[in-house]
Structure formats: C-alpha cells, structure tokens
Amino acid sequence: MTARPLNELVEEGWARALEPVADQVAQMGEFLRTELAEGRQYLPAGQNVLRAFTFPFDQVRVLIVGQDPYPTPGHAVGLSFSVAPDVRPLPRSLSNIFTEYTEDLGHPQPSSGDLTPWAERGVMLLNRVLTVRPGTPASHRGKGWEAVTECAIRALVAREQPLVAVLWGRDAATLKPMLAEGDCATIESPHPSPLSASRGFFGSRPFSRVNELLQRRGIEPIDWKLP
C-alpha cells in the first residue's frame, strides 16, 4: 500500500468519513511496508487493501461484515467474501453463500465468485481486518485495522439514512451495539463457513430479508443477481 493522502486512496465521501483515522491508515501503510521489507508478504495486493472504500459512501444501503481476507494467495481482492473472476474452486464460505443465494432468490449459480456487482449497487463488503499474511488466518488481527473499520461502520451508522447490516457469525455479531446507535436494521445468522453453515446459515434467507427491510424503510431494494 503506497504512502499517499487518504483522498487519493479512497472515494471522496469515504475520505471525509475516515478523516478521524487518517493517521491510523498511514500507520497501517507503514506496517505493511515494513512487513514487505522484512520478507513477509500480505494479502490482498496493495492496490486492493482499501478497495471496499472506493465505492460511494453515500450510496451504501447494506453492510456485510467479514472477519479478515482469505489467506490463500490469489483469493483476496479487498471485498469481504469476494474472489477474482478466475478463481476455481471457490472458497467454501462463498460456495455456501451461493447455495443460499440460489435457494433464497431462485437465481442460477453465479458464473464466478466476483461480488463486485454487489459493491457497485450499494452493498459494502467490509472485512474488520483488511490484510492477512498468506497462509496464516487472523495474522493481522490486533495490528490496528480494527480502529479504521470501526470508524467506517460508525460513519455509516451516523448518516441520516437507513442501513441494513448482515452479521454472519459471532465475530460480526459483536458489532450489534455499535449498529444500534443509528437507523440500522440487522440480520444475524451463523457464519457461512463449512463449520457452521448447517447450524442456521442455510435457510436464513438473508438476501430477501435485506430487501424486505429496505422496502419497509422506503429504500430501493438491492438487485442481487450476479452474472
């Protein structure tokens, strides 16, 4: 991640929203450069670390919270749960998300694991920790990203517009008190990982429930359909 001003790294609205943690973002950039200098790689690639913040802040209607990026090289792309279009096989969590997507909405299985269309339509795909060491899950937890992503979530909640947050798993559920501070509805279920998907993620209908909550608030529903 290059050392550049925040407004050159993220969308204009996000640059304003993240201004309180601009110094922390800079410190995390320095942390990543030190990692590289000492021979330790990180994921996703530098230009994708802040990718979730390159879509318009004012257009976010839905927040889907992940934990940290996929640790498998070639998988992480800076949007929670998403992968590059050419990734095969899909990560198991994403495969389970697509199983629920087809059951909930009746759409066919998507042709790839690229969730960029959701991000372009107002769904923020945010990991609480934005980087990871390859092959080592959770390796960058507690390094400083949490302050940045917490600021981002608080900024979304503080807007004078409705938000629906999708909380998959116990880690994401800890955000519920923060989300309760504003006009934010929440949808909770177990995580889509193979360890927990059968304990309540399957059958939870998150996509149609999000749209029901948006429409109840007079907000345009999300077009979830993927190519």
From Swiss-Prot:
Q: What one GO molecular function would you report for this record?
A: uracil DNA N-glycosylase activity
**Which cellular component appears as one GO term in the record?**
cytoplasm
Q: What is its main location?
A: cytoplasm
Q: Name one Pfam family in it.
A: UDG
Does the record bear Secreted in its keywords? no
Places the protein is found: Cytoplasm
Sorted UniProt keywords: Cytoplasm, DNA damage, DNA repair, Hydrolase
Q: What is its EC number?
A: 3.2.2.27
Q: Which reaction does it catalyse?
A: Hydrolyzes single-stranded DNA or mismatched double-stranded DNA and polynucleotides, releasing free uracil
Residues of the active site are: D68
**Where on the tree of life does the source sit, at the highest rank?**
Bacteria
Q: GO annotations under biological process?
A: base-excision repair, AP site formation via deaminated base removal
* NCBIfam families (alphabetical): PRK05254.1-1 (NF003588), PRK05254.1-5 (NF003592), ung (TIGR00628)
- Record family assignment: Belongs to the uracil-DNA glycosylase (UDG) superfamily. UNG family.
Please describe what this protein does.
Answer: Excises uracil residues from the DNA which can arise as a result of misincorporation of dUMP residues by DNA polymerase or due to deamination of cytosine.
Protein name (Swiss-Prot/TrEMBL): Uracil-DNA glycosylase
Instruction: State the organism of origin.
Output: Mycolicibacterium smegmatis (strain ATCC 700084 / mc(2)155)
User: Which gene produces this protein?
Assistant: ung
